From Swiss-Prot:
CC terms in the record's Gene Ontology section: cytoplasm
Name of the molecule in the record: Uroporphyrinogen decarboxylase
UniProt-listed Enzyme Commission number(s): 4.1.1.37
Subcellular location, record wording: Cytoplasm
Source organism of this protein record: Prochlorococcus marinus (strain MIT 9313)
Enzyme class of the recorded protein, top EC level: lyase
Gene3D superfamilies found in the cross-reference section: 3.20.20.210
Chief location of this protein within or outside the cell: cytoplasm
Sequence positions that bind substrate: R26, Q27, A28, G29, R30, F45, D76, Y153, S208, H323
Alphabetized GO MF terms: uroporphyrinogen decarboxylase activity
Amino acid sequence: MSDSQPLLLRAARGESVERTPVWMMRQAGRYMKVYRDLRDRYPSFRERSENPDLSYQISMQPFEAFQPDGVILFSDILTPLPGMGIDFDIVESKGPLIQKPIRSLSQIEALQPLEPNATMPFVGEVLGRLRESVGNKAAVLGFVGAPWTLAAYVVEGKSSKNYAVIKAMAFQQPDLLHRLLNHFAESIATYLRYQIDSGAQVVQMFDSWAGQLSPADYDTFAAPYQKRVVDLVKSTHPDTPMILYISGSAGVLERMGRTGVDIISLDWTVDMADGCARLPEHLGVQGNVDPGLLFGTPEAIRERIVDAVRKARGRRHILNLGHGILPGTPEDNAKVFFETGKTVDNLIGSAA
């Protein structure tokens, strides 16, 4: 068995691997003291994510602390928006704010095609530096927001509890929304290609708010554009594994499996055994420990990891949380998660 490629990359490709790889969504962030200390010195999120030295440093913090099998770019799904002509800010404890929400045909027609090399070269620089730093000790992950979720932010203008504004557009002006979604699909595919060319070995698409759609509306406003992104990327980078994550995905799990991605990331509301049974065998799975469990005891964390990995046995599986790690999570418990993840196959074997 060759170890010339990182474990997580080999697992994501469906190769036989020596153990289950593990990483964590939002593994670089507020639960880590080193991140909070840096945030105190650089309070602007956009500066932290768009200054290549800061983004690189933050991306490496969890790798230096826990040695996960994946190192993900520290960035945000909204980072490409200014390159399309949409300005935004991220306010601490409030989330993203879009200065001028996109709600008219003239605004959509004014959007620019994304040219990542020109408008966000810092992303390419950070990905290249991460590859140089981690070598084959970890896979470098890139990520994007899917078209529906990006549209939800730019139409609503901020995070939302009921998504009334974009749903009003969907049901009153569907042609307008489809134009916006198509623009995002083309630009996001361009952005993913840029990330891969810059050093990302595995990429994840977050359609965080697609779980707010009924299955029928998911088929209309989310899935076709997820698939469009996947098709465009696979046409030029067929060997790069692609992961799809949706928060609250239980109602659309089978539909996710038809988008062309390689791996479905399950949230914690789906039992791992049920998720595996509902998805075609050729698809890998990622997840899916409840991030809230990391406030519990080490014993409870270990037990839940063993349960998830045991239920995913026989499948291509990447251990992860079912959502991003929560602020305030004890760092020692994050350490338990990673250490258990690296030894869980032995734990299952000894208990068998």
